[in-house]
Amino acid sequence: MFFRIASIITPVVLIIFAGWVYGRRAHPDMSGINKATLDVIAPMLVVSAFVSKDFELLEQWNLLLCGVAIVLGSGILAWPIARLSGMDPKTFVPPMMFNNCGNMGLPLAVFAFGTVGLAPAVALFAVSNLMHFTLGVKLVNPKASVKGVFANPMVIATILGVFLSTTKHLYTLPEPLYQSIKLLGDATVPLMLFSLGVRMKDANLKHWREGFLGAAICPIAGLVVALLISPFIPMTDLQRGLLFVFASLPPAVLNFLVADRNKQDPELVASIVLLGNLSAMIFVPIGLYLGLK
């Protein structure tokens, strides 16, 4: 089991490390690539996953509902911890709820379960993103407007993907169009990992105490919720494995972008995100062990 987990984690770590080394040496401006990834490439991955022949949306509802429960349950568990530690819940709670199911979760799903694990992992990623751009933004800034959420490419891709998936028996995309979408979307996984490595070279450890607390609470809360609900929800072995990987993931980089946009202590959130992603070396193997056993 140890060698299997190591073989899953190693490619993820090496690609992130390659991004970090390149970032330290070349100091690239990744803003254009990151924007293209979020606006075009990742949405194509969502659409291609939902319409793939091996993916049936109705068969994934239990997994997706469990994913929603982990997001909400982690927030409920994190709220009193934020109060007790003297942190503003608007700063601390969202990073505990919304994890790195894109940059790290998608590659782990592929390396752990093969290509058959990608489509349901993308569905989890899409649902988590939809919650982040609505509930997550409101938690950080209760006055924020979410009217523009339906103009977000990821949200549009999710809605389109759900529609195409549920109408697959009536209409399918022409094969050349599907292959074009899939080819572009397949670039998401390595780009996200490499970009995460580049971003980590600029990390701020000013709030390292809060960062270590968040690094532990995010995966622990997720795994606790997963352990509580998994015995009562019927799932396949693949779905159970994906659920525990999802539960063990660190805070998403997107939390920093949302905090920065809303001026909600972005430096503290940056520390939580950085140390959380470093701590993935500890908690993701635990999630893999629970999901693979």
Describe every region a protein language model picked out.
Residues M1-K293:
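Alpha-helical transmembrane segments of multi-pass small-molecule/ion transporters
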